Every structure is written in C-alpha cells, then in structure tokens.
C-alpha cells in the first residue's frame, strides 16, 4: 500500500523535515516544558548565530524564549541593539568571532555564497562545534560554490568548507 501523504515529496524534502525535527528536539528544553516557556535552571544551551537576518533572528528569538543563551552576530553588531534589547538578558550581539567563541552550538544563517569567506576567515574556530547549517545553494546567487554544492551536495560542500565542525543540515 502506497503512503499518499508523502508520495509527492522528494527525498530531499522529506530529509529536511526529519532533520528539522531532530534539531528542534535536540535544542528543545527538557521534557515537560513547552517551547514558549523558559528552560529549567541549568539546561540552557549557548548558541552563536552567524547571520542575524530573517532566518537567524527568527530562530534565535525562539531559542531565547525557550530559555537558551544566544549571541546574534553580524558584520555590524551595533545594528542588532533593538533585537537583543527586546529579548532580555539571554540575548546579546557581537561579531562572528565572538559568536564562535560563545556558542557550544553554532547556527549559520547567511547566504551560501558567503561560506567560502566564512571558512577562510574563521575555519579553525568551527572545530569541535555542532554547526546547524541552514544554508541552501542557489546557482543564480552563489556562483561557483553554488555550482559545487549542486554537483557534490550541500552537506558535503559545507562539511569540506567547515572542516572540524559537526555539521547538521537543518533547512
């Protein structure tokens, strides 16, 4: 019998949904609490966000509301003042280097075309970190790295660029 609910899904789309579920589960507060509630004392995860645009700020806001400590980074951290002031003491703003030092978990929310420069500037700082990779290569926008990711796969390309990081594809 064929499962009609998933028959129109591509394998990649199904994998993305499953990966997002596991990432959410991994970063969720302890059982018995809801995402909107603060995490119980002592269970907070320190998360560094690289790229605090639409995706990074939205996901980071949810993590702060769930009780985790989040450092939002940007090339211009002063532009994040309103965001972090509105989220309270668990949120702060800083540079990419500060986010990498701060976070036990790193969330990357920048265009995929920025990954080679990110790797060049901060590659060794990803070593040993759990890296939640939200990047998706778009050929028209991301040039050569987009072509490379299309041919070899985004996960393998990210793993090569961010060598030493424990890559989790999430989006």
Each language-model region and where it sits:
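Bacterial N-terminal signal peptides that target proteins for export
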Residues: 3-21
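Bacterial N-terminal signal peptides
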Residues: 16-32
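NAD(P)+-binding Rossmann beta1-loop-alpha1 motif at the extreme N-terminus of oxidoreductases
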Residues: 35-82
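Active-site-proximal beta-strand/loop segments in catalytic clefts of secreted hydrolases
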Residues: 50-53, 73-75, 96-97, 110, ...
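Active-site phosphate/pyrophosphate- and oxyanion-stabilizing loops and adjacent acidic/basic residues
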Residues: 81, 120, 156
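Rossmann-like NAD(P)-binding element
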Residues: 88-91, 95-130, 134-142
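Rossmann-fold NAD(P)-binding glycine/threonine-rich loop
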Residues: 135-170
